[in-house]
């Protein structure tokens, strides 16, 4: 039998400045994986994390 889906989801967050900023230290897009609680956080997640391509802390938004 298949098990029931849990409440926690594994999601990917991506740097918002890497896509639009050509003045980066290195080419590429910063992505992190994290988990979120489906019941408590129903909307898209936004966190400030370090981006090695921009060389600073930036807002990372959830992508599908």
Curated annotation (Swiss-Prot):
Position of the signal peptide: none
Keywords carried by this UniProt record: Ribonucleoprotein, Ribosomal protein
GO cellular component, one term: ribosome
Pfam families referenced in this protein's UniProt entry, alphabetically: Ribosomal_L33 (PF00471)
InterPro entries: Ribosomal_bL33, Ribosomal_bL33_CS, Ribosomal_bL33_sf, Ribosomal_zn-bd
The UniProt record lists the keyword Ribosomal protein: yes
GO biological process: translation
Single GO molecular function: structural constituent of ribosome
Family membership noted in the UniProt record: Belongs to the bacterial ribosomal protein bL33 family.
Record's protein name: Large ribosomal subunit protein bL33
Origin species: Microcystis aeruginosa (strain NIES-843 / IAM M-2473)
């Amino acid at each position: 039998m298949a098990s029931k889906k849990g409440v926690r989801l594994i999601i990917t967050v991506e740097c918002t400045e890497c896509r639009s900023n050509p003045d980066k230290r290195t080419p590429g897009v910063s992505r992190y994986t994290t988990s979120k609680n489906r019941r408590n956080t129903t909307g898209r997640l936004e966190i400030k994390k370090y981006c090695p391509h921009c060389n600073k802390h930036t807002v990372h938004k959830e992508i599908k």
